[in-house]
C-alpha cells in the first residue's frame, strides 16, 4: 500500500509561545491587503503592508538574536514558512543596517542618481522638514539616528 502524505506541518517546540502574535500579525496583514485605497496615492496603499512585514520580521529577530527566547530550529522553521523576511533580517545583522525599514530603500536601481532612499539619510544631515519615504512611508531608518 502506498504511503499517504498528510498536509499537517509538525511545529517545533516553542511554537505555542509565538503563534498568537504571529497569527495576529497575519490577520493584520490580510486586513491591510484587502483595505481599499480610495483617496490615497498608489504608493501609500502599500505602506501598511511594508510596516507589518517589518513588525513580523523584527519580532522574530528580537526573539532569536536579542532575547534568545526561541530555538534555532523554531527560528529557521518560521523563516522557511514565510513568517519573516529572511533577506531583511540578514541586512539587520550588518553594521549600518540595524534599523533598516525595508529592502527597497537600499536598492539603487529604484532611485534617481543610483543612490539610496531619503529615509537612509541621518537626521542631523537633513533639512528641518520631515520627509517620508515614497516606498514604505518610513521617516528615518539610518543607524545614526
Swiss-Prot record:
GO cellular component entries: spliceosomal complex
Domain of life: Eukaryota
Location in or out of the cell: Nucleus
Keywords: Nucleus
GO BP annotations, alphabetical order: mRNA splicing, via spliceosome
Coiled coil spans: none
Family indicated by similarity: Belongs to the BUD31 (G10) family.
Protein name: Protein BUD31 homolog 3
Amino acid at each position: 500500500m502506498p504511503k499517504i502524505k498528510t498536509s499537517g506541518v509538525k511545529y517545533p517546540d516553542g511554537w505555542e509561545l509565538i503563534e498568537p502574535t504571529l497569527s495576529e500579525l497575519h490577520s493584520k496583514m490580510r486586513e491591510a491587503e484587502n483595505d481599499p485605497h480610495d483617496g490615497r496615492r498608489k504608493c501609500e496603499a502599500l505602506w501598511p503592508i511594508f510596516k507589518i512585514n517589518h513588525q513580523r520580521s523584527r519580532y522574530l529577530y528580537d526573539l532569536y538574536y536579542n532575547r534568545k527566547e526561541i530555538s534555532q530550529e523554531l527560528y529557521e522553521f518560521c523563516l522557511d514558512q514565510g513568517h519573516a523576511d529572511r533577506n531583511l533580517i540578514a541586512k539587520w545583522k550588518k553594521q549600518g543596517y540595524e534599523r533598516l525599514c525595508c529592502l527597497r530603500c537600499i536598492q539603487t536601481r529604484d532611485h534617481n542618481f543610483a543612490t539610496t532612499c531619503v529615509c537612509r539619510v541621518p537626521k542631523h544631515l537633513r533639512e528641518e522638514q520631515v520627509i517620508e519615504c515614497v516606498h514604505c512611508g518610513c521617516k528615518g531608518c539610518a543607524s545614526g539616528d
